[in-house]
């Protein structure tokens, strides 16, 4: 079970870092609305740029904490529950603008995985 939890933390943490630090300026099939990058995606949701920076900072910080929790278990709950909360927000934004359900699949998957990490 310990190795499974490490794998889940690596998958969630590294995926979030990839989205926000590596692929933020790239188009993906998962972006909200017709957005080609994160800035356009937040505009599609009707959210200001400062909110994008706030959410991005929180997601990156929580992803780093989740990765750190592999070695420091005391930060696991705050990282996993924090990511779950942010992913719930992401899913709700996709629903708000009427995106097809498939666009919210990654956020929903990370929501579920974060809850598994937090609760097991």
Regions found by a protein language model. Give the residues of each.
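Membrane-interface extramembranous regions
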Residues: 1-120
